[in-house]
């Protein structure tokens, strides 16, 4: 009896997952996330240098982050841009150095372009959530500015805290001595989950449940880690782009990776947005089934009378 219940429960869970995957596929097709990702990748490449310039300017404004700029750059390029990180870092740093020599008007233009990227992310994600109500202009600008200013500071603070924990000798000689290096090794994964969770909770102009956002963030982070390893493997085993483009190979490689990254971000957003829709649909199906069963019982009783 117990085995039959277990098999029935497992079958019901698997059927539910399969139905959710069908619903998710339909949603992804309707939203054309490949086109959205292409648009965001294009805007990201235009905004990449301004975003990095603004980020580094914010970090340099705080003395506590003065000595860790190079560590932050290395951490980002090694963990979030696979294989071609060194060449990308060299070019972007050169572009940022040139941009920082500009006038106040030029630097202001960089900030505007950086805000343009955040605005496009906002519109794309709210399109996935089917939200028609727009935020007031003041609220939107405040949110974009908060991302530009607080984002780099929080990232720097996280890395400083991690470096401090690693430098402590609190766990040396204990059973936990091997835990800290393991946590540090998983740090990019934790950052990815936290970043995706923040995006899926804050950006949509609608209420998003924490569990739904967490599920989407975990799936997106796992896909991101797999994507990094797969993309790095492709570049090392099949170096066709370097053979064709030579010194310019960094450009299409970077575009491909940014495009793939946005596909992953949007898939996580689709999962987060699809969860409440699917659960509501399941609930309605159960209610309708119960009503149908009640009606059939009533008709049966009337027939017996």
Curated annotation (Swiss-Prot):
Predominant subcellular localization, coarse grouping: membrane
Superkingdom of source: Bacteria
Location(s), subcellular: Cell inner membrane
Record keywords, A-Z: Cell inner membrane, Cell membrane, Membrane, Transmembrane, Transmembrane helix
GO annotation, cellular component aspect: plasma membrane
Entry's family note: Belongs to the UPF0761 family.
NCBIfam families found in the cross-reference section: PRK01637.1 (NF002457), yihY_not_rbn (TIGR00765)
PANTHER family: INNER MEMBRANE PROTEIN YHJD, UPF0761 MEMBRANE PROTEIN YIHY
Name of the molecule in the record: UPF0761 membrane protein Shew_3545
Species of provenance: Shewanella loihica (strain ATCC BAA-1088 / PV-4)
Lineage: Bacteria, Pseudomonadati, Pseudomonadota, Gammaproteobacteria, Alteromonadales
């Amino acid at each position: 009896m117990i085995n039959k219940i277990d098999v029935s429960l497992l079958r019901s869970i698997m059927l539910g997952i399969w139905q959710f995957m069908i619903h998710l596929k339909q949603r992804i097709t309707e939203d054309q996330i490949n086109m959205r990702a292409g648009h965001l990748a294009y805007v990201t490449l235009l905004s990449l240098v301004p975003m990095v310039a603004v980020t580094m300017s914010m970090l340099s404004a705080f003395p506590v982050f003065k000595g860790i700029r190079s560590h932050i750059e290395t951490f980002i390029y090694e963990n979030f841009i696979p294989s071609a990180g060194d060449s990308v870092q060299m070019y972007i740093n050169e572009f940022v150095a040139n941009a920082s020599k500009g006038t106040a008007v030029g630097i202001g233009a960089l900030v505007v372009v950086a805000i343009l990227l955040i605005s496009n992310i906002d519109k794309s994600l709210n399109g996935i959530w089917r939200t028609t109500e727009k935020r007031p202009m003041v609220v939107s600008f405040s949110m974009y500015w908060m991302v530009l200013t607080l984002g780099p500071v929080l990232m720097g603070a996280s890395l400083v805290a991690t470096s401090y924990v690693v430098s402590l000798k609190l766990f040396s000689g204990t059973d936990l001595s091997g835990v800290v290096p393991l946590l540090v090794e998983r740090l990019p994964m934790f950052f990815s989950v936290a970043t995706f969770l923040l995006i899926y909770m804050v950006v949509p102009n609608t209420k998003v449940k924490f569990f739904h956002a967490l599920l989407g963030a975990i799936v997106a982070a796992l896909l991101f880690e797999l994507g990094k390893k797969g993309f790095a493997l492709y570049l090392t085993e099949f170096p066709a782009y370097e053979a064709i483009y030579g010194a310019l190979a960094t450009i299409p490689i970077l575009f491909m990776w940014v495009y793939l990254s946005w596909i992953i971000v949007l898939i996580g957003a689709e999962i987060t947005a699809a969860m409440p829709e699917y659960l509501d649909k399941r609930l309605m199906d159960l209610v309708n089934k119960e009503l149908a069963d009640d009606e059939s019982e009533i008709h049966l009783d009337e027939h017996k009378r």
